[in-house]
Amino acid sequence: MIEKAGILIEALPYIRRFYGKTVVIKYGGNAMVAEELKESFAKDIVLMKYIGINPVVVHGGGPQIGRMLKRIGKESDFCAGMRVTDADTMDIVEMVLAGKINKEIVSLINRHGGHAVGLSGKDGNLIEARKLHVYRYKGDDQPPEIIDIGLVGEVNRVNVSILDTLAGGNLIPVIAPVGVGEQGETYNINADLVAGHIAGALQAAKLVLMTDVEGVLDGGGNLISSLTVAEAADALQDETLKGGMIPKVQCAIDALQSGVDKVHIVDGRVPHAILLEIFTDAGVGTEIVRYRRGQSVG
């Protein structure tokens, strides 16, 4: 009993610090598949709301999209961690993300006592998007090659008034990462990047990115517990990071530069990873910050 009391006392300063603040959580990976992890995620979100924090959930769905594409005999191709998306693939992406996964998450949270509302970026023009251009650099003396990866977008603008209205109504937004272009075209947007832009637009206290590894790993596979923006940018430049970790770290950098206080990349395979990150001294995963305490900013 004393140990349990100690846990509550440890959480108290964090509850005070984040009361009334916004925390954006990117939900994805194994935490969306294993039943125990799904339950712990939903409980974490509901508890945050009950103690006065405003959680905003942005979800992925890459594996589920991949399985659906495979069922219809369509191959999945990736470039720089992004899914190459033609018109047929976009239809599947939207169906799986906005029509299936989003509603499952809403139902899961509501079943545990929350009041979640599902949205895609097309609802109320929540996420205005433009086509994403990917560049492949060949060398110092050559112009970069522009790679067309189809209907893959990047966030142009987030209409935060919708999210403010939901938060004011004691509701928990659950957002599918589908955006809308100027001509009404639909874009598939990486969920990490959507979460980062939303966190920046809301000036969130924290952005938490859930993944299927311990956090950011170095070249030897060891966990890096803390990175500054400059160190994270170096890791991107020297190709220490691979695959899906690339957009996560880029998202963290963008969010911090947009005013988010701190970003955490956490192991979603750990039950209650969100609560451990926010309400304990040790935390989990990798934290990314603008500068370390005491570091000169120039």
Swiss-Prot record:
Catalytic activity, reaction form: N-acetyl-L-glutamate + ATP = N-acetyl-L-glutamyl 5-phosphate + ADP
GO molecular function, one term: acetylglutamate kinase activity
Gene3D superfamilies found in the cross-reference section: Acetylglutamate kinase-like
Pfam name, any one: AA_kinase
An annotated GO BP: L-arginine biosynthetic process
Enzyme Commission no: 2.7.2.8
Pathway listed: Amino-acid biosynthesis; L-arginine biosynthesis; N(2)-acetyl-L-ornithine from L-glutamate: step 2/4
InterPro entries named among the record's database cross-references: AceGlu_kinase-like_sf, AcgluKinase_fam, ArgB, Asp/Glu/Uridylate_kinase, Glu/AcGlu_kinase, NAGK-C
Domain of life: Bacteria
Residues making up the signal peptide according to the UniProt record: none
Keyword rRNA-binding: no
Compartments, record wording: Cytoplasm
GO cellular component, one term: cytoplasm
UniProt-listed HAMAP family: ArgB (MF_00082)
Family statement: Belongs to the acetylglutamate kinase family. ArgB subfamily.
NCBIfam families, per database record: argB
Role description: Catalyzes the ATP-dependent phosphorylation of N-acetyl-L-glutamate.
The protein's name: Acetylglutamate kinase
Species name: Syntrophobacter fumaroxidans (strain DSM 10017 / MPOB)
Gene: argB
